[in-house]
Every structure is written in C-alpha cells, then in structure tokens.
C-alpha cells in the first residue's frame, strides 16, 4: 500500500471510487462537486494505491488556523479493511507537523460520522439535509487522546 499525492491523471479512478459509494454514503449530486473540488479547490489531496489501483482518497484543506479533512472515501468493496483509518492517520500526522493548525475539522454525513467518532472526532453540530435531501451534515472536531 502506498499513500501519495493526487495527480490529475488519477481523476477517473478517484471519480470511480466516489461512484462506488453513491448513494450509500454520498448523494449523486456530489459527483459534480468532487470534480469541481479536484479542478479548483484542491490543496493537499492524497490517494492510496494497492496493486497499481487507487483504492482510497482524501484531502486536507486549510482556513486560517483550521484544517479540514475533506473528500474521504474508500472503494466500497474495501470498507472495514483499515485503509481509511491509515489514510486518515497519515493526514492527521501531516497536519500536526505544521504546527500552525489549532483545530482539525471534518464535515461528514450521518452515514459516515461513526468512522470519525471511532478515530477521535467529537460531534459539535448537525445540520439536516445539508449536502442533499436525506444527507445531513455532521460537524466534528478532532480531540487528541
């Protein structure tokens, strides 16, 4: 398993990963949102390669002294394999080495918040139908143990 920075040539594989998680974890309209993000809003974004295939992806965005865990997903056939946890930990470690970040945030849905909760994030807010009808936004902050 290799974690490396995203490259433009990864686009179709990353979009296929997202598609494998629609509609269980992401709303169909988020497909276009991800394309926009990767084209115009990307800051630090990483992919996980296994056997020459991208099996997970996730990013970090920054705003003032906050770091946002963004656009996380793992191939739907590999959920529970530990790859998502490894990618999350990789990004948390990168954020911590910068020193300027005071708070690590994730905005997720009611379908994925349990993953973040198990990995040290605490719910601070919830907004109904934020991402799309039936997809609430759960605002969580990392609390290091």
Where are these regions (language model features)?
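Conserved catalytic-core motifs of GNAT/GCN5-like acyltransferases
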Residues: 105-107, 117, 122-139
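A conserved beta-turn-beta hairpin within the catalytic core of GNAT-like acetyltransferases
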Residues: 61-70, 79, 98, 134-136
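Residue-level recognition of the GNAT/N-acetyltransferase active site
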Residues: 7, 75, 107-109
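A short beta-loop-alpha structural element at the N-terminal edge
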Residues: 1-14
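Conserved GNAT acetyl-CoA-binding A-motif
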Residues: 95-108
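Active-site rim helix/loop that mediates acceptor-substrate recognition in acyltransferases
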Residues: 24-47
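Conserved beta-strand in the GNAT
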Residues: 47, 53-61, 66-73
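Conserved acetyl-CoA-binding loop-helix of GNAT-fold acetyltransferases
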Residues: 74, 80-93
């Amino acid at each position: 398993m290799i974690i490396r920075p995203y490259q433009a040539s990864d686009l179709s594989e990353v979009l296929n990963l997202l598609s494998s998680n629609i509609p269980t974890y992401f709303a169909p309209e988020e497909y276009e949102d991800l394309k926009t993000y990767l084209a115009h809003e990307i800051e630090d974004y990483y992919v996980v390669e296994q056997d020459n295939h991208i099996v997970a992806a996730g990013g970090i965005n920054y705003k003032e002294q906050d770091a946002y865990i963004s656009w996380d997903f793992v191939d739907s056939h590999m959920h529970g394999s530990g790859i998502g946890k490894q990618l999350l930990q990789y990004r948390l470690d990168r954020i911590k080495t910068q020193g300027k970040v005071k708070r690590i945030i994730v905005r997720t849905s009611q379908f994925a918040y349990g993953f973040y909760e198990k990995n040290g994030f605490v719910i601070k807010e919830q907004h109904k139908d934020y991402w799309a009808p039936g997809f609430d936004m759960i605002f969580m902050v990392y609390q290091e143990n």
